[in-house]
């Protein structure tokens, strides 16, 4: 059976401290140009964020976050780009939606701001609920101890779904993200990826965000043990995009859009050829 077309979400960080591209797109023209380039490369969604969630990052003032993202969201939306706003704050999400954003990507899974659920129930737009069990902890990036990471992440995500539905959100608008690298070890991340079909089996769309993350840098470390730099992790990211597509993911969130678009096209052609051979 041929997989459904996979959404490729391009990452656009309008921040000064994101782990991969912090400081690259603080200028409005640079940010818009990059967003348009990702769309031209095949991104169906451009995910605009104004606050880094990398380990060690400090939270920014809501006004700063808003001032960073709104001009970019507004300009990209005006040019016909489907824009997602990457934020944990309902006020930022509201402003972005009012300026053309069509989706909310919430790395807290709705746990950081109780106003997010009611807002998105009213707005009726897609909402990505990411798993980050330690989001409210004093040390939110220290890996959590899990008994069975796959079962627990799945249960936590379904609890977030239940909370969203209780707030009035249409369950058909929800997308799940297992939160690779968020208070998880490399072993946790690989276990979750291996068990991706278990998340897909919930019937709720699943977004995979592995792009350039630390566990890939560790996997690709040289003989000296030095971790592969972030800009050298795109091939590995594209392989994960291909495997995620093969196993039924709804979408992938990536920095290098073209590499993942190409990888997914290979999977779709491979599976399509199998179908043609069988039907012929």
From Swiss-Prot:
Name used for this protein in its record: Dihydropteroate synthase
Amino-acid positions noted as binding Mg(2+) in the UniProt annotation, renumbered to this chain: 13
PANTHER family, alphabetized: FOLATE SYNTHESIS PROTEINS, FOLIC ACID SYNTHESIS PROTEIN FOL1
Pathway: Cofactor biosynthesis; tetrahydrofolate biosynthesis; 7,8-dihydrofolate from 2-amino-4-hydroxy-6-hydroxymethyl-7,8-dihydropteridine diphosphate and 4-aminobenzoate: step 1/2
UniProt cofactor(s): Mg(2+)
InterPro entries tied to this protein: DHP_synth-like, DHP_synth_dom, Dihydropteroate_synth-like_sf, Pterin-binding_dom
Assembly notes: Homodimer.
Gene that this polypeptide is encoded by: folP1
Residues annotated for (7,8-dihydropterin-6-yl)methyl diphosphate binding in this entry: 21, 86, 105, 177, 213, 253-255
Organism: Mycobacterium tuberculosis (strain ATCC 25618 / H37Rv)
EC number: 2.5.1.15
Domain Pterin-binding stretches: 1-265
An example Gene Ontology CC term for this record: cytosol
Keyword annotations of the record: Folate biosynthesis, Magnesium, Metal-binding, Transferase
Regulation of protein activity: Is potently inhibited by the sulfone dapsone and the two sulfonamides sulfamethoxazole and sulfamethoxypyridazine, with Kis in the range of 12 to 32 nM. Is only poorly inhibited by p-aminosalicylate (PAS). The inhibition of DHPS by sulfathiazole antagonizes PAS-mediated growth inhibition and therefore confers resistance to PAS.
């Amino acid at each position: 059976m041929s997989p459904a077309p996979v959404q490729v979400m391009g990452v656009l960080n309008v921040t000064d401290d994101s782990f991969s591209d912090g400081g690259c797109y603080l200028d409005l023209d640079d940010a818009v140009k990059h967003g348009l380039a990702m769309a031209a490369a095949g991104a169906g969604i451009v995910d605009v964020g104004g606050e880094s969630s990398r380990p060690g990052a400090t939270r920014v003032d809501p006004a700063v976050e808003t001032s960073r993202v709104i001009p970019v969201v507004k300009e990209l939306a005006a040019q016909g780009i489907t824009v997602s706003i990457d934020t944990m704050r309902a006020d930022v999400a509201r402003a972005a939606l009012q300026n053309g954003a069509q989706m909310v990507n919430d790395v807290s899974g709705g746990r950081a701001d109780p106003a997010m659920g009611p807002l998105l129930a009213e707005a009726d737009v897609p909402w990505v609920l990411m798993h980050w069990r330690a989001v409210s902890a004093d040390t939110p990036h220290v890996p959590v101890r899990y008994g069975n990471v796959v079962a627990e992440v799945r249960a936590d995500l379904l609890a977030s779904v239940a909370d969203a539905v209780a707030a009035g959100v249409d369950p058909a608008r929800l997308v799940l993200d297992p939160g690779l690298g968020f208070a998880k070890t490399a072993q946790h991340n690989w276990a979750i990826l291996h068990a991706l079909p278990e998340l897909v089996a919930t019937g709720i769309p699943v977004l995979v965000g592995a792009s350039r993350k630390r566990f890939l840098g560790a996997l690709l470390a040289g003989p000296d043990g030095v971790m592969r730099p972030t800009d050298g992790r795109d091939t590995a990211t594209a392989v994960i995009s291909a495997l995620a597509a093969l196993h039924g993911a709804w979408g992938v969130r990536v920095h290098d859009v073209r590499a993942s678009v190409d990888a997914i096209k290979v999977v779709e052609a491979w599976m399509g050829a199998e179908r043609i051979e069988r039907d012929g």
